[in-house]
From Swiss-Prot:
It comes from the Bacteria. Keywords: GTP-binding, Nucleotide-binding, Repeat, Ribosome biogenesis. This is GTPase Der. PANTHER family: GTPASE DER. Residues 3-167, 177-353 form the EngA-type G domain. Belongs to the TRAFAC class TrmE-Era-EngA-EngB-Septin-like GTPase superfamily. EngA (Der) GTPase family. Associates with the 50S ribosomal subunit. It comes from Porphyromonas gingivalis (strain ATCC BAA-308 / W83). One of its GO terms (molecular function) is GTP binding. PROSITE patterns: G_ENGA. Residues 354-437 form the KH-like domain.
Length: 437
């Protein structure tokens, strides 16, 4: 885990199409509904037995279809600072533009591995015209057609060559939770970090020659042992302003991927915003434990139970269908309920390793399934005969049925909700698999 590839380039060169091709995503990338575009900004790529994360940096830029030099520069600086490999996408149909040259100049000055991707190369003649991208001074251009997938295999092979070697066996104590504190800028991440670990946070700031792998710092606070997950770049200021919202999302990726439990900080004075949903989505996609903290609760005047209930309902509604997570109202500045945060993180971590005996699972679940069976499909009745928990890091359950292919997503959610109703998995995702008996 932890290798990160960023896609950069001016608008309309095919970055999103390439992203969808590499992640094998089938989502409509032009959907306008709120929340529908966030899936295309972050994904996982599997190639030749290895896996890495990929981000389309343009996905977090508001109005990214407008060609603003400043916004393009920000994207490129983010990629240079955070990614292991940068894919610089250019449009072979339009050729080199002044904006392309500006991006290339920034990339040349960096020491980051860069692959020039000449997109929309559909035939032999196009291959010849792609030679003009040598003018970037960034090595051989890789000719692809993102729409059809032509050339992407060679591109991925090259990405594999440039990615840093995977780490060997970890020296971490696997019995201790790895905590990542994530959230939008100014939501209170630094204040909570300081409340947890005080002034020693600067002791581990500078590690010469460090890669972009996550840093694990072990702490003991309030009698609880834990690791705080950080990334090499997160404590230093780069050329990109720290308060850029999409920058904070990209910086969260490594910490999330290398954690067990994520503390998602929300600002009580602002509620749930689009970047909160982006970060939540990444936590979900990586099947991490979740504790949601409503910070700056000291600034809210009306703290009545009615207001608290309204806050809770609004937040769970925004994060649906996953709503079974602890939600704490805190103030990192005044240290209100700080111990409760760590205590809850440890509880969520324990829930991830909950094991239910098979006989008990069947004793509870089979009568429920018999009373509310899966809907019949094409006149055929679906019968679930048996259920067992799988030996996985994330709680996972296999239900054995005669026609597993006809069990739809709503019924899987029903099964998950029944498991949650009978056993405490608060804060941790559950995977439901339907297999043939």
């Amino acid at each position: 885990m932890g290798a990160l590839v960023a896609i950069v380039g001016r608008p309309n060169v095919g970055k999103s199409t390439l992203f969808n091709r590499l992640t094998q995503s089938r989502q409509a990338i032009v959907a306008e509904e709120a929340g529908t575009t966030r899936d295309r900004q972050y994904g996982r790529v599997h190639w030749n037995g290895r896996e890495f994360s990929i981000v389309d940096t343009g996905g977090w830029v508001v109005n990214s279809e407008d060609v603003f030099e400043e916004e393009i520069n920000k994207q490129v600086y983010i990629a240079v600072e955070e990614a292991d490999v940068v894919l610089f996408v250019a449009d072979n149909q339009t050729g080199v533009t002044s904006l392309d040259e500006q991006v290339a100049e920034i990339l040349r000055r960096s020491k980051k591995p860069v692959i020039v991707v000449a997109n929309k190369v559909d035939n032999t003649e196009d291959h010849y015209s792609a030679s003009e991208f040598y003018s970037f001074g960034l090595g051989d251009p890789y000719c692809i057609a993102a729409v059809s997938g032509s050339g992407t295999g060679d591109l991925l092979d090259r990405v594999m060559e440039l990615l840093p070697a995977e780490n060997g066996q970890s020296d971490l104590d696997e019995t201790l939770p790895r905590i990542a504190i994530v959230g939008r800028p100014n939501a209170g991440k630094s204040s909570l970090l300081n409340a947890f670990i005080g002034e020693d946070r600067h002791i581990v700031t500078d590690i010469a020659g460090t890669t972009r792998d996550s840093i694990y710092t072990k702490y003991n606070k309030f009698g609880l042992n834990f690791y705080l997950v950080d990334t090499a770049g997160i404590r230093k200021r780069g050329k990109v302003n720290e308060d850029l919202e999409y920058y904070s999302v990209i910086r969260s990726i490594r910490a999330i991927e290398n954690s067990d439990v994520c503390v998602l900080m929300l600002d009580a004075t602002r509620g749930v915003e689009s970047q909160d949903l982006n970060i939540f989505q990444i936590i979900q996609r990586n099947s991490k434990g979740l504790v949601v903290c409503i910070n700056k609760w000291d600034l809210v005047e009306d703290k009545s139970q009615a207001v608290i209930k309204t806050f809770e309902n609004a937040i769970r509604q925004r994060f649906a269908p996953f709503t079974d997570f602890p939600l704490l109202f805190i103030s990192a500045m005044t240290k209100q309920r700080i111990f409760k945060v760590l205590e809850t993180v440890n509880q969520v971590y324990a829930h991830r390793s909950t094991r239910i005996p098979t006989h008990k699972l069947n004793e509870v679940m089979l009568p429920i399934i018999e009373a509310t069976p899966p809907p019949a499909t094409k006149g055929k009745y679906i019968k679930i005969k048996y259920v067992m928990q799988l030996p996985t890091a994330v709680p996972s359950f296999a239900f054995f049925a005669n026609l597993p292919q006809w069990v739809k997503e709503p019924y899987k959610r029903f099964l998950e909700n029944q498991i949650r109703a009978h056993w405490d998995f608060c804060g941790t995702p559950i995977n439901i698999f339907i297999r043939e008996k």
